Swiss-Prot record:
The lineage of its organism: Eukaryota, Fungi, Dikarya, Ascomycota, Saccharomycotina. Belongs to the Mediator complex subunit 4 family. It comes from Eremothecium gossypii (strain ATCC 10895 / CBS 109.51 / FGSC 9923 / NRRL Y-1056). Component of the Mediator complex. GO terms for molecular function: RNA polymerase II core promoter sequence-specific DNA binding; transcription coregulator activity. One of its GO terms (biological process) is positive regulation of transcription initiation by RNA polymerase II. This is Mediator of RNA polymerase II transcription subunit 4. Residues 1-23, 214-294 are annotated as: Disordered.
Amino acid sequence: MSANQLSKAATPKATPLGAAQGASSTSLHSFTSFQPQDASHVEQNKLHSVAIYEDLCQYEESLQRLVTSVDKFQPDLEAAQELIEIDSKLYSNLAQLPKYDLIDSQLKKLEEESKDIDERTAKILGILGECYNDLNSLPMVEQVEFEMATMKKQKDKVNSSVLLEYAMKLSKFTRVPPTFNKDAIGPNNFIWPAEDAIRRGMLAMASLKSKELTSLPGQSDQEAEQASAGKEADTAGPGVSTLEPANGGHNRRGSFEFTGIRKPPPASDADSSVVDDGDASMDLDLNLFNPDEF
């Protein structure tokens, strides 16, 4: 069979496809060039692309024309001649059936590979889209370089002494993390004083204000000074000796001694009760020493 006959047999009338050089090229071209349609149109295009199917269609048309002419008692010799030629073509094309079968299996394999490639392409496109979004969320290289240059300039301007001073200020409000060493005692450099410093300060204040702490409530400053001066005079000069006789008699009155300081009059029972109350009110808890801290 010549190339012209093959091209004429492989070119269907219902499809706009160009003439193919052979049966295999015709079938491959038809499968790769048709646009997506429904299943019936796809199957029809596949059948029209096969030369044997086209020969069968022509054989059926020629046989129908010949039968019609014979029924009218006017036999058509051209239809009979065309029928004989088509029959010879069909006989010669029967040897190409295994080739068509091989082409069909190859097409099915290519369709499966194409479907697999489409799925992988869709997956790759999805990953590329995610990577694109991640890259858009990152800062630009120029921006990062500008920020690094700015930070470097700022570091160059900061002096080490200023940095150390700032670190010392921060250290007063920070401490070692508890996960580092829980048993270690941190530095006592807080902005508030420690407890021992507070105790020493309270004792110093008490020593400065000893007169106020030792004075009785309701007593004036002059009387307090006189009382303190009298106590000092008693401790400085010889005291008045009191002797108690064995028979339980009255105490003897001591000799008179002039010191230049007026002694206070003897206190009565009411005054002694007031003094006792004052002593009770003066009982201040000034023992702030804690030996456990040293």
